[in-house]
């Protein structure tokens, strides 16, 4: 039933360009000549505007035949009251736009008096940030160079230590070889001494037995 009612209302609106003669509720208006016609008289957020939106004038009664024609003739047929109403709404819209622009400008200025001072402050902040970043980069470069120098010094120290260990090991090996050669000579001398003593003991024994 409700769907048929909306369908019939849409058909009537198409025939007579959607003029509505009913009472105007404050919650129906959206600031222009387009108003929301709500069947139950209570506009809510869940109401579909496309199903209950009609174009009507705030004036006396009109016939459907008077609404037919071009938009130019419709605009020319406005009464003085309607023109004042339209102008008043346009002034209100312009005031709201200007108020929004002033708020956005005051928000952009961030407490400054003019854009010049705001831009100078921003340029100073950008310059300070650039100088700080340049200083940080310089410090990083110096630390990197110091690290490279320390690494090179440590590498050279390690090389020197390794070479020193090689030289020391070589000297120890040479000393060990010398000691081993000396021990071998002493061993041969000791063997000769023992053999000579054995020969003498054998000869003395033979001489003793003969006597």
From Swiss-Prot:
Is the Transcription regulation keyword given for this protein? no
**GO MF annotation list:** protein homodimerization activity
Q: Name one GO cellular component term.
A: Golgi apparatus
PANTHER family according to UniProt: FIN BUD INITIATION FACTOR FIBIN, FIN BUD INITIATION FACTOR HOMOLOG
State the species of origin. Bos taurus
- The protein depicted here goes by the name Fin bud initiation factor homolog
Task: Tell me how this protein assembles.
Answer: Homodimer; disulfide-linked. Seems to also exist as monomers.
What family does the Swiss-Prot or TrEMBL record give for this protein? Answer: Belongs to the FIBIN family.
* Pfam families the UniProt entry points to: Fibin
Point out the glycosylated residues in this chain: 30
Sorted keywords for this record are: Disulfide bond, Endoplasmic reticulum, Glycoprotein, Golgi apparatus, Secreted, Signal
Please list which residues make up the signal peptide.
1-18
Annotated compartments: Secreted; Golgi apparatus; Endoplasmic reticulum
Family annotation (InterPro entries): Fibin (IPR026772)
Encoding gene, per UniProt annotation: FIBIN
Q: What is its main location?
A: secreted
């Amino acid at each position: 039933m409700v769907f048929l009612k909306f369908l019939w209302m849409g058909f009537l609106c198409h025939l007579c360009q959607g003029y509505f003669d009913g009472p105007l509720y404050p919650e129906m208006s959206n600031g222009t000549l387009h108003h929301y016609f709500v069947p139950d008289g209570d506009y809510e957020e869940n109401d579909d505007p496309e199903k209950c939106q009609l174009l009507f004038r705030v004036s006396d009664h009109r016939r459907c035949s008077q609404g037919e024609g071009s938009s130019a003739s419709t605009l020319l047929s406005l009464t003085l009251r309607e023109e004042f109403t339209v102008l008043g709404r346009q002034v209100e819209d312009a005031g709201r736009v200007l108020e929004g622009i002033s708020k956005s400008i005051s928000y952009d200025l961030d407490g400054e008096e003019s854009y010049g001072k705001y831009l100078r402050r921003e340029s100073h902040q950008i310059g300070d940030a650039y100088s700080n970043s340049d200083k940080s980069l310089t410090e990083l470069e110096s630390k990197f160079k110091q690290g490279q120098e320390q690494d090179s010094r440590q590498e050279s120290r390690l090389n020197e230590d390794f070479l020193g260990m090689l030289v020391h090991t070589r000297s120890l090996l040479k000393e060990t070889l010398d000691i081993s050669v000396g021990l071998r000579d002493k061993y041969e001398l000791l063997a000769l001494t023992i053999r000579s003593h054995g020969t003498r003991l054998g000869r003395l024994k033979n001489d003793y037995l003969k006597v």
